[in-house]
Amino acid sequence: MLSRTFWFSLSIVFSILYSILFLQIAFGSEYSIQDDARRSIVWMMRFSDSELFPDDFLMNYYQWATPSALASLYKLMSMVGINAILFNKLVPIALGLISTIYCYRVSLQILPVPLAGFISTLFLNQNLWLKDDLGSGTPRGFLYPLFLAFIYYLLRSSTIPCLLSLILLAFFYPPSVLVASGVLVLRLFSWNNQRLRLTTDRREIVFCIVSLLVVFLILLTYLFKSSDYGAMVSLAEARNLPEFGQDGKIGFFHREPLTFWTCNDYSGIFPRDWCIFNPFKRKFFLLPPQILLGLALPIILYYRSHFSLAERITSALFILPQILLSSIAFYLISHAVLFKLYLPQRYTEHSLMIVFAIAGGIALSMLIDKLLEWGGKKTIASGITIIIFL
């Protein structure tokens, strides 16, 4: 059996390899810059030269809209001589490595088998580097390492690090801290003897109350943040704006109900990368192989007597459905109060990526272990082939 150090090191190696591919694109041209960064980060060049973009309405707006934690980090980097655009191209490497480390650790909390941790990080890196989120260096790029850190420390019952990661999450990407808060609440309940029961652990209850109070106070700063750019667009206004129509720039209100609720940008419940366009320009739901593996995990656990690794699954597994329930709940709430809680898809697309990467890694490792039981060590080649294919 290969050591935990080997699989952890291999996870780091793959994260670095993905980073190298990203760097080739990021530094491929003198004027190369990620699309979201072009809007949300360029204004931070003012930290290096305060005379830039004088009276520029859009730059002023993005400066106002950027979370203070992100702006402070970029400002700190500019103070040590790293301008915003250069730092924007470098920070995704660190974000990817931290996400990989915490994903590996979370996976091992659920199934203490190093192979499961490696496969989970491999799936996660595929998801992250094929999207623009991590590479953008914008607030949602910081979501992944911070949310995974929160989950890891929550599973470890490490109170201070967990609370710290929750606070950072609130300052960097507010929508995700609502999902995290929902997870905290759900963990206070358990299903026992066909009844829903509240935990009697006073430590958990106190931690949940304190965490929710801290999050509430931080979110209040966003609620009462003064604005020179008018109020948030209302649902009635959005329905009459062509930009929000199916063919508009935002395309929120899709005419097909199924597409609107599943794969449509901003309104659909699934990540955009799980969907493809058909020849008639209607979006359909597409399941990548690792997503199918994640969906197969409950089936594998139902037949747990046939899988020897199932005995090593810990109670930490419940964190995955808790994340899903919290994400879906806030997705529906966001739809109910459209645009007051930002965009509905923000509450599910990132958490689904994380949950299915971990679930898929655990499921595949259990299947590979079963193959080894059937065919001996020679079938490990088949398992490796499956991983590469996926």
PLM region spans:
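N-terminal membrane topogenic signal
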Residues: 1-13, 202-203
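Transmembrane catalytic cores of multi-pass membrane glycosyltransferases
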Residues: 22-37, 48-55, 61-62, 174-181, ...
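Hydrophobic core segments of transmembrane alpha-helices in multi-pass, intramembrane catalytic enzymes
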Residues: 139-148, 179, 183, 349-357
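Transmembrane alpha-helix segments characteristic
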Residues: 308-337, 359, 382-389
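Hydrophobic/aromatic-rich transmembrane helices and adjacent perimembrane loops
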Residues: 340-375
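Signature aromatic-anchored transmembrane alpha helix within multi-pass, membrane-resident enzymes
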Residues: 367-390
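Membrane-interface transmembrane helices that cradle and orient dolichyl/undecaprenyl
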Residues: 142, 147-161
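Active-site lumenal/periplasmic loops and adjacent helix-entry segments of GT-C-fold
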Residues: 7-145, 174
